[in-house]
């Protein structure tokens, strides 16, 4: 996991020379529930944490728009992105804990749309604040979307020992 997505490195250095010289041919972005797309309602909080937004025009909302922008930059590596559960969640409700039914419906609709538009899969992470607030119900629902489209649902766990089976 190279973090080329989080810091907009894929746009700032599309050739990704350092990775190519090391033999890396593919980057899978959007790990740990954080992705560059979709950015619903124009929310940029997920991106702003890692990158200076003055360096690139983040001009996409939907995953298809992100993919089009990426294609224009002609990356030097294969680049696939997961749709981030925490990114969607944060865009919908900020830091509140539980999604209401309508909000969950929006989250699932947007995740499904992102996969239809080319997202490689879905990612969640229970170690980050947004992911840690997610209910089992919404995580299972995202898993069902991944199954529906036969794509991975990658889940990051921060605690590999204590509390893992709780």
Functional labels for PLM-detected ranges:
Residues 7-13, 134, 138:
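Short, glycine/acidic-rich beta->alpha junctions
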Residues 5-7, 57, 101-102, 133:
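Residue-level marker of alpha-helix boundaries and capping positions
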Residues 2, 52-59, 160-165:
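Short linear motifs at secondary-structure transitions and domain/linker junctions
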